[in-house]
Swiss-Prot record:
This is Actin cytoskeleton-regulatory complex protein pan1. It comes from Aspergillus terreus (strain NIH 2624 / FGSC A1156). Residues 641-767, 973-1172 form a coiled coil. Residues 54-83, 323-346, 391-401, 634-646, 1264-1284, 1456-1469 have a biased composition (Polar residues). Residues 818-845, 943-961, 981-1016, 1039-1106, 1117-1137, 1144-1161 have a biased composition (Basic and acidic residues). Residues 298-307, 1193-1209, 1379-1391, 1400-1430 have a biased composition (Pro residues). Residues 17-52, 85-124, 347-366, 908-917, 933-942, 1210-1227, 1368-1378 have a biased composition (Low complexity). Component of the PAN1 actin cytoskeleton-regulatory complex.
């Protein structure tokens, strides 16, 4: 079972059949090099060189001659090792081959051949041949023992396959008997069944391949590829399980596994070991050992091919080799013929070839059968250093050393460390490697492998110098003398060598064969030696060579193998002799035949070792519990303590003294161990104390950094009280979300119903005779069949009444189906919008819920439990800790509290300063926010409100993202800081409040006007307050655009603030929990801040609700105004249709109407001259803008320059000379659209002085003290100057019949916002509409001035245009004084700038004003307004006639073609 044959190369038992000799792949081996044909390997100096041990042993010569190994086959049991006197020397140079019994061989000379004899090369027998049936190595060893008279133990007799008589519990007795018979018939004399045979038997069961594979895996418990009988029985049992339909288990039960393994062990110990114990280990490698047990064998060389080298090759192959003592003649005695073979072996002279034996040493016969004798010089043995020799080209030997000083030395058994000397040249770079790997300060900074690598010749074995260096390294790194180096330390050491990771992994695997994760001193030396070899170019071996196996490992493995062999052979012999029946009664020790050191003929046979030890139970002394109870014969046997007492009393004085000395030595050793342990403990304590102090210093530094960080106050969020408060607040907000969502849905439903109702009203106005003009009386305002019947009856009555009155019957424009289709289409649109809004509401609700969950998760500390919280509080309170740690914790708390108080004081000072600076800023000017990229150190974001605001901003960000996903893209804006955001929000609140007040006043005025209009009672023009501000114009597209821009800007600002909040939120998560003693105070502060925040939030929500109501009312007002416009248009169309039908009958009435028109214009001119007198109370050549400019800005002499709008600076120059003044109607027309703008920036900038409502108007309003180039600001100034111009009464003035100023076809920039609704609303269409307006305007009573002023020119349905310029001004224009006035400002361009789009074309200049009364200009082109100079109350006929003569009245009868766009330009003549 354990092969330990020491056969040579080519022997009969040198290799097992089919087994690859180990280390076949190794190329560099110390003494068994492989020589391919025609190539000689360069010899290497070896550390542990094999030595000849007394019989012929072919070794490769160190001189490089191609000497082939000789197969001998002789056992190593009887010959003693020969000492050559020089450790590490080359093998014996000249020995005669010994007869081996295999084949006769010619003698060979080792070393350099003599001069007279050419080198002879033998062709040895091939190694690795299969075993010969004639003789085995064991039989040859036994034959040697027989010849020497020794009595070896009887060899085990082959008794066939023996199966122990053990009953297996998992099968029946009958099945076990059948399985035994089948197993014996299949294996014969073997104890195991091969895998192939087992496969044939198992395939007969006809099971599937997967089942058989699983059965084999479960059965082959030894994983050897063979089955013992219990394994075979288990396989049969598992096959039976599968054949009966049951499933195979994944793992065997413990009982079955134990039974099978126990029986396998019993069978294995019955197998005898046929190999004898080696008496003496030699340097001959054992090539027959298994892979894991051959600890001594180098790789088996391959058999080289015979080749006859030439002399030149021999000369080239000779290199310097260390030589020492001359070899001694060995061999068998010539007069003995062993084993029946005639072999006359004479002693063979050795030594240096070609030199006479002039030394004092004579060859000594060593006889094979004689006693072992030492050879060579037998005098004293002083150590001799290695002496290098070398043969130059002339083959002259160099120094060989003196013969007198050479003595026999140990031979260097493989693995016998410390007895191999280094080469004479020393080991290069070894000191550099030592210095590199030694622990030293600063080694972490890097290392260099320069100087470590080389190409030195390094032997396999570790030399004494190397071992000393490696031991020093080990002790330097093993500071606590633990006896080993851990993996981390070894990685640090080995990593400094510079080798790559793969090589270091392989080296570690070889050095740590037991996989313990650490290295002792010997294993560390092995690893360092392999690293040293690798640095010098040698590859890392795949298997550890025998020279490098540590002695501890090798001896332990050999001892285990020997004990197993002894046990098995002893058990077998005792079974054969029957001695096992009474093992304690025989009195014979069979252990005398065995020894760890060798057989009975070994020199140490008289010495006892562990194999002869026998335990003596009576020798044990001490207390015996049975000594106190001796009850006659029934009791237990008396204790043998008396005999031990007697044995101690019989000790002599010397023995007692010896015991005392031993005890003293043990006590000293114990004291030394205690001192060493105490020193180690002190060192550990000092190290722990240093580490603790270093850690406390680091904690202090980190705490100081936390306390001084700008965001240090945010760590209060980790406080449990504040976290709970935030949770409650978050829960309150979550509870409000469903209510807000339901409110939004209710508002959406109301909006949808209002839209449907509005559509019904509009459709009824657009189609007055349609079936849709039916008031539904059903549920929800639905139209029932009864309503339709009533509507048809009403239509028939109207038709009959028209027929009776002589009027044509009202034509039905569409049928009921068309009205239903329109309603259905509008309902579908409304429903789609409502569903879209509902989806947006759901998305916003989901995003709010997701954000609330994320906030709740962030506020909820999942990892915290009651136990951890309790332990944390105990640690913070310094409970259960040492005094040093308690003082340290209290010191940290004091420092943190001081820093917190200091931070709070700084934060209180910072907001007050920022607040003061905010108050000092002008409220009307908003500086552009600079991009915020700085730190947050100056931010007052250390309060509860700031954190809540940040959370609100994050929620708004999510909502904005959902809105953006729905198609509403927020406007991108540069990010702003928290201070800027707070300032902006404050200004917005002030502006919203101001706008709310203004809109309240405007809404009240609109309500009063609407009530008066619905009652139909015209207000007296004389009661109009002087300077009353006109009501707001209907909403425009620009107002809606400004509102959208405002919301987008706010969303972008919120989104920009969220980016900044992200970093703060991350810092909040990492904050520390505050001290326990501050909890109560912080809770009170948090509660107060929460109450303040709730109050502020409620106020803000109230303001927001008020603003929302105002916005809603504004929308309703817009819808009502639009409805009124559509109703007026419908009435105009209706009248137009009637007039078109009766145009033939009214032909005669046209002349009368023209006369009425002239009279009406004359009356209108008279009233307008009376009312507008104070408005034009300016110098003759001045204008309102010119009079305002000096008051607003006195220093610049030309006032038009600052009054010109920035968007159109190029238009002011050509228009200044040709436009003397701006009419008040144009001013009012240009100002009225802006009255309803919701843009906060426009409201803030454009209303510095007149934005406040004026319930008690004054005659004149002082303009703002500050002049602005903003067009909106200038419009407000013009409004101030033109509004109080109406004094007196003008009963016949019809502002609604004035032709709008912006209806001139060449001005696109002066039109009102290019609104399609406004285009349709203009009543200046065809002549029929003009006539109808004139006709019904003269019939109706005069309208109140409030209604007249409210209407912008875009809403006037009549074509009559008002020209307030009197004739005297037109006549006085050419006769102006010599001092010409400054050029007037441009006409309504500044008013058009904010209304029109940015890309609107500039208006062309009007025609030049003639010096005298101009003729009527082309149709649609307004005349240049004359400068107002008429005094107040000047209403004489001369002025009116002069204005009529100027052509004013003639323009009013021009037909305005509505087939073209009202905003299109015309080419002037």
């Amino acid at each position: 079972m354990y092969s330990s044959s020491n056969s040579f190369l080519g022997g009969a038992n040198s290799a097992r059949p089919g087994q690859q000799p180990p280390f076949m792949q190794q190329q560099q081996q110390p003494s068994y090099s492989q020589f391919p044909p025609g190539q000689q390997q360069q010899p290497q100096p070896t550390g542990f060189a094999p030595q000849p041990t007394g019989y012929a042993q072919p070794q490769l010569s160190s001189f490089g001659s191609q000497l082939q190994p000789q197969p001998t086959g002789f056992p190593s049991g009887q010959l003693q090792p020969q000492f050559t006197g020089f450790p590490g020397a080359a093998p014996q140079q000249s020995q005669q081959p010994q007869p081996t019994g295999f084949q006769p061989q010619q003698p060979q000379f080792t070393g350099y051949p003599p001069q007279s004899q050419p080198p002879q090369l033998q062709v040895p027998a091939a190694t690795g041949l299969p075993l010969r049936p004639a003789q085995t190595s064991s039989e040859i060893a036994n034959s040697f023992r027989d010849a020497s008279g020794a009595a070896p133990p009887p060899p085990p007799k082959s008794s066939g396959s023996k199966i122990p008589n053990i009953r297996l519990s998992f099968i029946t007795a009958q099945d076990q008997a059948k399985f035994e018979q089948l197993f014996k018939s299949a294996v014969g004399d073997s104890q195991t069944m091969s895998g192939d045979k087992a496969r044939e038997l198992l395939l007969r069961s006809r099971l599937s391949g997967s089942d058989l594979s699983k059965i084999w895996v479960l059965s082959d418990s030894t994983k050897s590829g063979q089955l013992f009988f219990p394994e075979f029985a288990l396989a049969m049992y598992l096959c039976n399980l599968r054949l009966t339909g049951r499933d195979l288990p994944d793992a065997l039960p413990e009982t079955i596994k134990n039974e099978v393994s126990s029986m396998v062990d019993i069978i294995s110990f019955q197998v005898p070991d046929t190999q004898p114990e080696p008496v003496v280990r030699t340097n001959v490698p054992n090539f027959d050992a298994p892979l894991m047990e051959n600890k001594l064998a180098p790789p088996a060389p391959q058999q080289p091919q015979p080749q006859q080298p030439t002399n030149s090759q021999l000369l080239n192959q000779l290199t310097a080799q260390p030589t020492g003592f001359l070899s001694q003649p060995t061999g068998l005695s010539p007069n003995q013929a062993p084993f029946g073979q005639q072999s006359n072996l004479a002693p063979q002279p050795t030594g240096l070839p070609g030199q006479p034996q002039q030394q004092s040493l004579q060859p000594q016969p060593t006889g094979f059968m004689s006693n072992p004798q030492p050879t060579g010089y037998s005098g004293p043995r002083p150590p001799v250093p290695p002496i290098p020799t070398g043969y130059a080209s002339n083959l002259s030997p160099s120094q060989t050393g003196g013969m007198s000083g050479l003595v026999a030395q140990p031979t260097g058994i493989p693995g016998q460390w410390g007895f191999v000397n280094a080469p004479s040249s020393g080991l290069p770079n070894i000191e550099a490697l030592k210095q590199q790997l030694m622990p030293q300060p600063g080694r972490e900074g890097g290392f260099s492998t320069a100087g470590l690598a080389g190409n030195a010749s390094i032997p396999w074995a570790i030399t004494k110098e190397e071992k000393k260096i490696y031991d020093d390294l080990f002790r330097a790194w093993d500071g606590f003398r633990k006896g080993f180096i851990g993996g981390d330390t070894a990685i640090e050491i080995m990593g400094q060598s510079g080798l790559n990771r793969q090589d270091l992994e392989r080296i570690w695997t070889l050095a740590d064969p037991n996989n313990r994760g650490r290295l002792n001193m010997d294993e560390f030396a092995v690893a360092m030696h392999l690293i040293y070899r690798k640095l010098n170019g040698y590859p890392v071996p795949n298997r550890l060579p025998p020279e490098l196996i540590p002695p501890s490992t090798r001896n332990l493995n050999d001892s285990i193998g020997t004990i197993k062999s002894l046990l098995s052979q002893d058990a077998e012999s005792r079974k054969a002799t029957g001695a096992f029946l009474q093992p304690q009664k025989t009195g014979v020790s069979y252990l005398k035949e065995h020894s760890f050191r060798g057989g009975a003929v070994s020199p140490g046979v008289g010495r006892k070792d562990a194999t002869l030890f026998k335990n003596d139970d009576q020798a044990a002394a001490g207390y015996r519990s049975s000594a106190r109870r001796r009850v006659g014969n029934n009791g237990r046997t008396p204790s043998p303590a008396a005999s031990s007492q007697a044995s101690e009393d019989e000790l002599s004085v010397e023995q007692l003294k010896k015991k005392i000395r031993e005890t003293q030595i043990m006590l000293d050793a114990v004291d030394f161990q205690d001192e060493t342990r105490a020193e180690e403990d002190d060192a550990l304590d000092r190290r722990d104390r240093r580490e603790a102090e270093s850690l406390m210093d680091r904690i202090r530094r980190v705490q100081d950094e936390i306390d001084t960080h700008p965001n240090a106050a945010f760590r209060n969020l980790d406080n449990g009280a504040e976290r709970r408060s935030l949770r409650r607040q978050l829960q309150a907000y979550e509870d409000q979300v469903p209510q807000v969502a339901s409110e939004v849905r209710r508002v959406e439903r109301e909006i949808a119903e209002a839209r449907l109702e509005l559509f019904r009203l509009k459709d009824a106005k657009a189609h007055p005779n349609s079936a849709l003009n039916i008031v539904g009386t059903g549920p929800g305002g639905t139209v029932t069949e009864a309503d339709r019947i009533k509507a048809r009856a009403r239509a028939r009555m109207q038709a009959r009444a028209a027929e009776l009155a002589g009027r044509p019957a009202p034509a039905t424009q569409d049928d009921e189906g068309a009205a239903a289709r329109r309603l259905e289409s509008e309902s579908a649109n409304v429903k789609a919008d409502r569903e879209k809004n509902d989806a947006m509401t759901r998305d916003v609700e989901d995003s709010v819920k997701d954000f609330a969950r994320s906030l709740e998760d962030s506020l909820k500390d999942v990892s915290e439990n009651s136990t951890r919280e309790h332990e944390k509080r105990r640690w913070e309170d310094a409970l259960g800790v040492e005094d040093v740690i308690r003082d340290f914790i209290y010191d940290l708390k004091r420092n943190s509290r001081t820093a917190h108080i200091r931070k709070e004081e700084a934060s209180r000072a910072s907001p007050s300063q920022s607040q003061q600076s905010r108050y000092d800023e002008p409220p009307a000017v908003r500086p552009s926010p600079p991009p915020s990229t700085g730190s947050t150190g100056s931010l007052p974001g250390t309060t509860h409100e700031d954190r809540v605001a940040a959370a609100k901003e994050r929620a708004q960000k999510r909502i904005a993202e959902r809105l953006a996903a729905a198609g509403l893209k927020p406007h991108s804006e540069a990010s702003e800081t928290l201070v800027q955001r707070q300032e902006r929000e404050k200004r917005e609140r002030e502006e919203r409040l101001k706008r709310a007040e203004e809109e309240d006043a405007l809404r009240e005025q609109e309500r009063q006007r609407r009530l008066a209009e619905e009652r139909g009672t015209p207000a007296q023009p004389s009661t109009k307050p002087i300077g009353k501000k006109p009501p707001p114009a209907p909403p425009s597209r620009r107002a809606r655009t400004d509102s959208a821009d405002q919301s987008e800007a706010k969303k972008a600002a919120d989104e920009a603030a969220k980016v900044e909040q992200t970093a703060r939120e991350q810092a909040i998560r990492e904050e520390q929990q505050v001290q326990e003693e501050e909890t109560k105070r912080l809770e009170d502060e948090a509660r107060q801040r929460e109450e303040e925040f709730m109050k502020e939030k409620e106020a803000q929500e109230a303001r927001l609700r008020a603003l929302q109501e105002q916005v809603q009312q504004g929308k309703i007002k817009k819808q009502e105004e639009k409805r009124r416009k559509e109703e007026a248009e419908r009435r105009a169309k209706e009248q137009e249709a009637k007039l078109a039908a009766q145009r033939a009958e009214l032909e005669a009435a046209k002349e009368r109407e023209r006369q009425l028109q002239r009279e009406l214009e004359a009356m209108e001119e008279e009233s307008s001259s009376d009312d507008e007198g104070p408005e034009f109370a300016t110098p003759r050549n001045g204008s309102p803008a010119q009079t305002e400019a000096p008051t607003a800005e006195a220093p610049p002499p030309p006032p038009p320059a600052p009054a010109t709008a920035p968007p159109v600076p190029a238009i002011a120059e050509p228009e200044a000379p040709t436009s003397p003044a701006t009419s008040p109607a144009s001013s009012r027309a240009n100002l009225s659209p802006e009255a309803e703008s919701k843009n906060p920036w426009f409201k803030k900038i454009g209303q510095p002085a007149d934005s406040q409502p004026a319930p008690v108007p004054q005659a004149a309003t002082t303009p703002s003290d500050t002049h602005s180039t903003n067009p909106f600001h200038r419009l407000a100034q013009q409004q101030e100057s033109t509004a109080p111009a109406f004094t007196g009464s003008a009963p016949l003035e019809r502002k609604t019949r004035a032709r709008p100023e912006d209806d001139d076809d060449w001005s696109a920039a002066g039109s009102e916002f290019d609104s399609s609704d406004d285009e349709d609303d203009r009543a200046g269409g065809g002549s029929a509409k003009q006539l109808a307006s004139i006709l019904f305007g003269t019939m109706a009573p005069p309208r109140p001035l409030s209604a007249m002023d409210d209407k912008s020119p875009s809403k006037t349905p009549t074509p009559v245009q008002e020209t307030p310029a009197p004739a005297p001004e037109a006549d006085a224009a050419p006769s102006a004084p010599v001092a010409a006035p400054p050029p007037p400002p441009p006409p309504p361009v500044p008013a058009a700038a904010p209304n029109g789009s940015a890309g609107a074309p500039p208006p062309p200049p009007p025609p030049p004003a003639p010096p005298m009364a101009p003729p009527p200009p082309p149709a649609g082109v307004p005349p240049p307004p004359a400068p107002p100079a008429a005094p107040a109350g000047a209403a004489d006929r001369g002025a009116l006639l002069a204005s009529i003569q100027a052509g004013k009245g003639l323009r009013k009868v021009q037909t305005n073609d509505r087939s073209t766009s009202s905003t299109a330009g015309r080419v002037l003549d």
